[in-house]
């Protein structure tokens, strides 16, 4: 990934924390604030939808933000792959998988090659895709 200053990646603006992903898309956190957690350490709280399906303050910490960033980048990579496969009949996607309904003559490797193409915003990232043929969906 291209090197950027950390000050370019996260910004607080108008009561929101925006974390910019390499794709240019942003993760958004509503009304963030630094707080002290139950162990006496520093944590970050923001407004989000809680288990009761109502707005509430959610406590988070560094590794959780890293997890959100990794999941966001993974989602962006999957979307890029799906755009490359838009001429195929994508019937579903599950996490990092694309499920394509295709003629028996369609080579699986063709779909794998499309998924392994690195987007310009992730230049240098090593991608590989594995695939298989079956007559119904199953987890490999």
Task: Describe each PLM feature range.
Residues 4-140:
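Conserved catalytic core of nucleotide polymerization and phosphodiester-bond processing enzymes
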